[in-house]
Each structure stands twice: as structure tokens, then as C-alpha cells.
Amino acid sequence: MINVKEAITNSLLNPIRHFKMRYLPLLMIYFAYGASGISGVAETFWVKEELKLSATALVSLGVWLSIPWTIKMVFGQLVDSVPILGSQRRVYVYIGASLIAAGTVLLIGLAGDYPWAKFASKENVYIISALLSVIGFVLQDVVADTMSTEVVDRSQPEEIVQEELAYVQILGRLAISLAGVMVAGLSGWLAEIFSYETIFKISLIIPVISIIGVTIVKLDVAKPSPINCPILCGGLAFAVFVVLMGYGQYQQWHNHLLAFIFKYSQEIVFLVSFGVIVYMLSLLLKDIEPKTKSFIIKTAIIIFVYRAMPSVGPGLQWWEIDVLHFDKAFFGTLSQIGAILSILGMWLFSDFIAKKPVHYTLIWLTVITTILFLPIIGLYYNIPQSLGIHPRTVAIIDTALESPFAQLSMIPLLTLIAIYAPEGKRATWFALMASLMNLALTAGGLFTKYLNQIFVVSRRVVENGQVVMPQDYSNLGILMIIVTVLNVTVPIVTIYYLMVRKK
């Protein structure tokens, strides 16, 4: 009984014990990223009401918006090797904040129907806005991940340094979750009370928070390392390739070969991205001791597969809005519950995550999250309703149970990078590994797109008084079942073959 009590006490107190005031400015940058969801509910409803984009088109857009996260190695190499105005950290965060602000201003222009925001169609301006914001967050994320290794006092014994590095990663994710708690319910309530334009104006506070954090942070910054041309030049060439492929997808091609190529531009970009990132990682890992190298590679593969699993897509939320009649305030309530329990879950499991093997963590994450999605499938087939249970009750309970596990999968890998990345190259290490993990999300987005093309789900779209797209949720049930089966079987089989099975 004493051991259980001690374990619970340690779980509750460890994050507090490991917090230091010198970590606070760094955590403000993570906090700003987590608080970006303050306009999330308003944006979801605005997109549904104002943009003529299908579920497949929105998923496809999400794939393209994940590409900046995939080319993080370019930003990482710049942060490691190219000071701007003598700064390797602050100026990059300032630039990122400026891009986020620019993207938000475009959203304000769209929502307020200002003439200066009509230089292109609403859909295209929205894409530009989203892209600017994403690039800004990517740049800030690269710098924050690098700083997470520089706020730790490395003059301590190595064992303590490694433990502190692990807890800085946990505290960073706690900061993101804490911000989510503070804005989750607020986002829904604001969407009920204020106009979309006003909410987007309020969200301009986000880049200000990150600017304050990076301005006051104290770091042990390594000297700039020499530019790694294969990574920087290759990354820039890859970025140009991605932009050209993205542009070409939306052009009319009379040449059949070009039309075929650009029809599958997302798939081509994914395959090229995978090859480029794996090659660059091989360059970074070549000097690592073989046993450690093998462990890092296996860990990366497992987390890649876990994050590459498909989701249901936007059709689920559309169904909840149109059929279950979930409104903005209720979505805000769900977000609030999820965010609160997410931070509690990460807090309680922090000691477990820091000390348990990654495959052990991911197995129970996979099983638990799969089981907890089953009530939502039940809602589609009216099982809770037939038992007299209200859909909102099911949604609240499901969110309450599932949310603590959403943020945990990346912490073990980030800790490994923080421990083994050499001084002067940490930004590149973080960026490349994060690029690989975000490429996994791109893979998940592609799988989601394919499933949505096979099992079509559509909301009702009216244009000029005419129904141009009818409402059809008949395929949503089978889509959710297939997604659930894939999400539980593929990661567990991968973990078994790489980490569990004896040689």
C-alpha cells in the first residue's frame, strides 16, 4: 500500500520537482502553440459555412499543409548554422511570429469581407493564410525544440542531465496541454458570442506570447556549426520541388503524362520526402554507436507507424453537427474536457513515460485509444440511444476517457534526440526526426483521403439557392470501423516484430 501511495505521490510531484524558472520562457513558446486553438471552433464552423470544399478536398489540403513540417530540416540547419543579426534563436522566433500574425490577419480579412482580402478566391486566400501560419509555427517549433536542450544545465552528472532532458520534453507537452485547457472551452463559447472576425482578432495574442518568451529566455547556445550542404541544399531543393508539385496539381495540363504526374503529386511528394529524410538521417546517424543507432531506428519506425494511421476525416464532425446537432458551445465543452484530462493524464503518467520503454508505452496507448473510440461508432448505430443514453453524454464520457492519451506518443523519441544529439547539431537532429514524424502524419492524411474516396461522406452544400452537394453519411459507419481496425492492428504487429519478438 505504501508503494502505491509513493508511486501516486511521485507521479503528482515529479513535474513540479523538475520545473525550474529558467524553463519558463521556453515553456511560453510551447504555450503559445497550444493556445493557437483559441480560434479552432470558429474556424471549423466558418470553413463549413463559407468554403465550398468537400471532405476529400479538406483532407487533401491538410496533406499539403503538413509539408512544411516535413521540410523542418531546412529550418533546423538554418537555426544551427546561420545566425541572423547575430542571433541563432530569437530572430527566428520573431520571424515565425510575424508569419503567424500575417496568416491571422488574412483570416480576419476573409471573415470581415474586407476588399483587401479579395485578391483571390476565398478558398485560395484561406490556403495562403493557413500556409503562412503553419510555416510560422514550424519555425518556432524548431527553435523551441532546440532550446529544450539548451535550458538544461549540462555541468551536472550525466544521469541527472538525461533525466532533466526527459522532463523538459514532458514539461513542454504539459505547457501545450495547459494552453489547450485554457482555450478549449473558451473557443466554443467565443464562437457562440462573437463574430468570426472578432475571434480571429483575439487570436493575434498568440504570436505575442511567443515573442515575450523568447525575448527573456536565457540559453547556453552552442557556437554555430558549419553548414551541412547535403542537408541544407538538399532540403531547399526539396522545398522547391514540393512547391512546384503543389502548384502543378491545381493547373490544367493538356499533356497526358504531366496530367497523370500531377494528379498523384501528393503521393510523389510523400515518396520523395521519405527518401530524402531517410537519406539525411543516415548521414546524421553514421557516427552513432551501432547499438544506440539500432535502438533509435527501431523506435523511430514504431512511432512513425503509430502516427501514420488514418483518421475518419472531417465527415465525423459534420455528422455530429448535422445529425446529432452538436453546437459550437458543446464542441467547446468537449474540447475543454479533453484538454483538462489531457494535461492530467500527461502529468500523472510523466514518470511512467520517462522510464518505460517506448514500445511498452505505445502498445497500451494503441489498445486504450482504440477501445475508447468504440462508443462513437456505437452512436452511429444508435446503440447508446436505444439504451436511453443521450449522444452528448456518450461524447462527454468518451472525450473524458480518451483525451489523456492523445499527447504522449512523441515524448520518448524527443527525449532520445535530446540525449544523443551532438552539440551544435541539435536543431538539425530535432528537425529531421520531427520531419520524419510529421511525414507519418502526411501518410496518415493520404490514407484518410483514400478511405474518404472509397467511402464517400458528404455534407449538404447550397450555392445560389441550389443544392450542389447532398448530405450523405451512409458510409460513415463502415469508415469508422475500418479506421479503428487499422489503428489497432498495424501498430501492434509492427511493435511485435521490431521490439517484442525474440531473434
Regions found by a protein language model. Give the residues of each.
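Intracellular loop-helix junctions on the cytosolic face of multi-pass helical membrane proteins
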Residues: M1-M21, A111-I128, L139, V151-V312, ...
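Substrate-agnostic recognition of the 12-TM MFS/MFS-like secondary transporter fold
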Residues: I29-Y30, V63-F75, V125-G188, M309-P310, ...
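Short extramembrane helix-to-coil loop segments that connect adjacent transmembrane helices in Major
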Residues: E49-A57, I321-F330
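Helix-to-loop junctions at the C-terminal end of transmembrane segments
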Residues: W69-S87, A191, L344-W364, N452
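Transmembrane alpha-helix termini and helix-breaking/packing motifs in multi-pass membrane transporters
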Residues: Q77-P83, I108-W116, G180-K201, Y250-I261, ...
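Primarily marks hydrophobic transmembrane alpha-helices of the MFS/SLC 12-helix fold
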Residues: Y92-V93, L362
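C-terminal ends and interior cores of transmembrane alpha-helices
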Residues: Y94-A120, V367-I389
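C-terminal transmembrane helical hairpin of 12-TM major facilitator-type secondary transporters
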Residues: Y360-P412
